[in-house]
C-alpha cells in the first residue's frame, strides 16, 4: 500500500486490501482510511488525520512521506495507527469542502446539516474511530489532526486543543512543543471538531495542528515543517524527541464571534493575521443592534472569517495564559 494517497485522490479501490509492511501489517479500510498494526504487541493507539479540509494539502503530503518511510523500512512502527484522509472528494477537487464544513459536524452534529457527502463522511469517520479504538486495549490514545490555516499567522505552527475535563498530560504537551508548535490554544467549550470528538468519546489526547497556510498540492514548501515531520517520525518509532525547544505560548478561548445573518460585519480585513492583538474596548463586529467588543485588556483573534455561512463561527477571541 505505497500508493494510498493516489488511490484516495482517484477514488480507486485497491486490488489487494491487506498485506505486510516492514514489521507491521496494513489494512485498507475504505477510501482515505488505512490501519497499520505492528507485528509486536503494543499498547498505544494513534489517529493521524489530515485533509478534513480539501484545500489543506501540506499535511497530506507529510503523511504520504511518513507512509513511504514506513513501507521502505527506514522508519519503525511502534503504535497501532489509523491514517485518515478526511475528505477525499474535496482533496481531489482542491477545494475546502464540497457542501459543508465537516469540522463542524462531529459528535453527531452532522445530523443538523443538510445531507451531503460531508455528512455521510463525518458519520463514516465517527464509526471508523469507534471500531479502531474498540478493537484494541490501548493504554495510550492520541489523535493528531493536521491542518493548515486560511490566513497567515503570527505563529507559523500552532495547536488547538479541545475542551477537556481532566488535566492535559505533560508528555503530550511536551511532544507538541517538540513538534515545533509555537503556541497552544485551549478551548473552554465543546465543539464539532474531529479532535473534540476523539477526546470526548474515546478519551484520546487530541490536538489540531495548524501548519502554515493552505496551498495546492505540489506547491508546499515542506521544509517549513521539518521539525514537525521529524517529531512525527520519532513518535511513530518510539524515539524520544528533543527537549531543546522553547515552550509554546499558551492561550485560552474567551469568546466566539458568530455570524447569524447577512447584517453581520466583521471589522478585520483580509490581511489580519491569526493572533493579531486588540485592545480593550475595540469594536470587533456588529450585527444589527449587537456589538462585539474586546472585554479583556488584550485579546487575540484566531480564524477570523467574515464570509462563513450564517450560524457558524466567524472568529475566536483569545487571552494569553501565564
Curated annotation (Swiss-Prot):
Catalytic activity of the protein: N-succinyl-L-glutamate + H2O = L-glutamate + succinate
Induction section of the entry: By nitrogen and carbon starvation, and arginine, via the ArgR and Crp transcriptional regulators.
GO biological process: arginine catabolic process to glutamate; arginine catabolic process to succinate
TM helices/strands, residue ranges: none
The EC number(s) this enzyme carries: 3.5.1.96
Pfam families: AstE_AspA_cat, AstE_AspA_hybrid
Keyword tags: Arginine metabolism, Hydrolase, Metal-binding, Zinc
Pathway annotation: Amino-acid degradation; L-arginine degradation via AST pathway; L-glutamate and succinate from L-arginine: step 5/5
Function, as annotated: Transforms N(2)-succinylglutamate into succinate and glutamate.
Protein name, entry field: Succinylglutamate desuccinylase
Highest classification ranks of the organism: Bacteria, Pseudomonadati, Pseudomonadota, Gammaproteobacteria, Enterobacterales
Amino acid at each position: 500500500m505505497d500508493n494510498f494517497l493516489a488511490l484516495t485522490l482517484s477514488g480507486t479501490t485497491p486490488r489487494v486490501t491487506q498485506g505486510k509492511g516492514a514489521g507491521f501489517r496494513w489494512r485498507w479500510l475504505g477510501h482515505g482510511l488505512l490501519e497499520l498494526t505492528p507485528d509486536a504487541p503494543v499498547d498505544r493507539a494513534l489517529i493521524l488525520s489530515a485533509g478534513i479540509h480539501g484545500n489543506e494539502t501540506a499535511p497530506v503530503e507529510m503523511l504520504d512521506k511518513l507512509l513511504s518511510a514506513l513501507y521502505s523500512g527506514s522508519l519503525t512502527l511502534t503504535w497501532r495507527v489509523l491514517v485518515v484522509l478526511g475528505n477525499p472528494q474535496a482533496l481531489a477537487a482542491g477545494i475546502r469542502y464540497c457542501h459543508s464544513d465537516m469540522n463542524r459536524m462531529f459528535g453527531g452534529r452532522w445530523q443538523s446539516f443538510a445531507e451531503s457527502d460531508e455528512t455521510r463522511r463525518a458519520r463514516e469517520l465517527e464509526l471508523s474511530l469507534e471500531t479502531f479504538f474498540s478493537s484494541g486495549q490501548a493504554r495510550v490514545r492520541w489523535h493528531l489532526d493536521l491542518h493548515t490555516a486560511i490566513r497567515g499567522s503570527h505563529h507559523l505552527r500552532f495547536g488547538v486543543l479541545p475542551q477537556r475535563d481532566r488535566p492535559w498530560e505533560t508528555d503530550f504537551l511536551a511532544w507538541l512543543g517538540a513538534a515545533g508548535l509555537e503556541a497552544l490554544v485551549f478551548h473552554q467549550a465543546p465543539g464539532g471538531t474531529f479532535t473534540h470528538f476523539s477526546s470526548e468519546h474515546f478519551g484520546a489526547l487530541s490536538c489540531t495542528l495548524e501548519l502554515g497556510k493552505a496551498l495546492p498540492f505540489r506547491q508546499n514548501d515542506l521544509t517549513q515543517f521539518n521539525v514537525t515531520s521529524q517529531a512525527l517520525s520519532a513518535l511513530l518509532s518510539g524515539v524520544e524527541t528533543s527537549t531543546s525547544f522553547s515552550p509554546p505560548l499558551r492561550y485560552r478561548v474567551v469568546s466566539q464571534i458568530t455570524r447569524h445573518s447577512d447584517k453581520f460585519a466583521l471589522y478585520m480585513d483580509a490581511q489580519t493575521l491569526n493572533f493579531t492583538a486588540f485592545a480593550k474596548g475595540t469594536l470587533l463586529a456588529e450585527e444589527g443592534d449587537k456589538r462585539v467588543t474586546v472585554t479583556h485588556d488584550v485579546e487575540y483573534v484566531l480564524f477570523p472569517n467574515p464570509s462563513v455561512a450564517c450560524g457558524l463561527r466567524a472568529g475566536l477571541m483569545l487571552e494569553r495564559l501565564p
